Amino acid sequence: MSQKAIKGYINLIIPAAGATPAPPIGPALGQRKVNIAAFCKDFNDATQAMEKGIPLPTVITVYEDRSFSFKIKTSPASYFLKKYAKITKGSSATKKEAVVGKVTMDDCREIAKLKMPDLNTKNIEAATKIICGSAASMGLEVVGN
């Protein structure tokens, strides 16, 4: 059985159960001559059980015969950090100048467990440090051990 020839990859962040032919999805898929309606239906069906509207990084593989497949990754760490800190956006200043919220070390550990499949480590402590670094970059103070 031979593999299909890959024409290209498209990286998009799409809200769960919220794929529509409107930009950015429509133009990105239209340039590769992919059936936009079929992608939107398949994506929305695949994300139906998830919380509506959460941002999902998605890698769409487009094949030469205009078919496609897609892989949904976990939401960005910044989304989870903002949710746990109950803020709408991170700090626009440097991390030492403006603290916009707080998260606990346990929150960071919980986010790290959710993000493990997409992080470049298999160690939960290293993953927690990665998430704590993201929190600091956003202007969040990490409290606890």
From Swiss-Prot:
Keywords: Methylation, Ribonucleoprotein, Ribosomal protein, RNA-binding, rRNA-binding. CDD domains: Ribosomal_L11. This is Large ribosomal subunit protein uL11. InterPro entries: Ribosomal_uL11, Ribosomal_uL11_bac-typ, Ribosomal_uL11_C, Ribosomal_uL11_C_sf, Ribosomal_uL11_CS, Ribosomal_uL11_N, Ribosomal_uL11_N_sf. Forms part of the ribosomal stalk which helps the ribosome interact with GTP-bound translation factors. The keyword Nucleotide-binding does not apply. Part of the ribosomal stalk of the 50S ribosomal subunit. Interacts with L10 and the large rRNA to form the base of the stalk. L10 forms an elongated spine to which L12 dimers bind in a sequential fashion forming a multimeric L10(L12)X complex. It comes from Rickettsia canadensis (strain McKiel). GO terms for molecular function: large ribosomal subunit rRNA binding; structural constituent of ribosome.
